[in-house]
Amino acid sequence: MPLRFGPAGVPLSCKGRTIVEGMDDITALGLETMEIQTVRTVTPQHFNEYWQAGILSWKSDFEMNMHGPYYADLLGDRRSRQRTLMKMETSLQAAKVINARHITYHVGPYGERKAGRETNEHLANILQGVVERCHQLWGNEEDEIDYAAFPWVLENNPTLIGVETSGQQSLWGTLDEVLEVVNHVEGTVPVLNMAHIHARGNGSLRTSEDFGELFDQVREQYGGKTFYCHFSGIEHRGGNAMHYTQLKKSDLKFEPLAEYLAEEGDWLDVTVISDSPLLEHDAMYMLQQYDKAKQKLLERRALEERRYKLALEAGLDPAELLAREQEQARLRTGAIAEPAETEAKKAKPAAKAPAKPANNRINFEDEDEDEDDIF
């Protein structure tokens, strides 16, 4: 199962602030991907740095990704939509230059539209045009000049257009809406922002079973196996995301997702980007938790295999042998607990006798109490 972790931006610990230096640091940390943030706009001076990063990613198989402008209004009036599409055009050009595998976009508020099929169909038509424009910009094999500058256009597919789940009730982007749209537009993929899904569901992702239901829904409605995920802690209220937090300070935990990916994720091709304020630190934490979950799974499977072999040798059913092991463990626990309780009783200190008042001190206990006193 391809599974990659990385930060959303140049690592905080990187001494240099260029993308190439950030890629070197990310690789040294044992991570395999990153997401470049074009949160507001892309200027011409960025493109030389993007091209250098694209060459490095092509030669090293380092996965590059990009996030388009944060503010979007694809469902607004014609003027607002055109302004958003112009920003998307520039980011699509940058995605080609940097050899991005995914580029993530927000859709924006519902505006005057209502949630439903009509709105989703309208958005699907817009995104179909975005995909077609991306393929035009990507170039073709016959363009020698394009091939000389961007050799990956011959080997790699055009950038996938990612449609992100939103974290506000007023914004388009529930999981159902995203899956319905990407299922009808080839060249798009769902971007599962787990913090946003958790917030809109009022804290819905708490166990590995919750994540299992999420991915089962995606598999049934979308049918693909390639997923691009954002993960971070989140502070939320009333079904709305407030702001990102570090993982250890949120009720959204990565351990249940790590457990699910270790046990059921063999069919997935997953990229997980850390949106946490700690960036690469929480990306490394997620990788460590996944490795721990994988190790526990291997140990459990080895134990089950050993139990199965012992059961065959003893002529027992493996379930019967498991029941015996559990009973023996219970008896051992009880045998250890009983002496501990006995020792605790023996060690209990005797109650101290009340101290006698000194002769040179006033003894208030001998005086009659006045029932009228408040204190």
Can you describe what each PLM-predicted range is?
Residues 1-90, 189, 299-374:
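N-terminal pre-domain/capping segments
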Residues 72-77, 111-115, 199-202, 238-241:
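A short acidic, helix-capping loop that chelates divalent metal ions and anchors anionic groups
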Residues 23-29, 45-65, 90-99, 131-135, ...:
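Acidic (Asp/Glu)-rich catalytic clusters
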Residues 74-192:
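Active-site acidic/histidine proton-transfer and metal-coordination neighborhood
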Residues 184-194, 198-375:
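Histidine-acidic metal/acid-base catalytic patches
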Residues 47-54, 81-88, 119-125, 175-178, ...:
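Charged helix-capping and loop-helix junction motifs
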Residues 3-9, 34-36, 64-68, 103-105, ...:
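Hydrophobic faces of well-ordered beta-strands that scaffold small-molecule active sites
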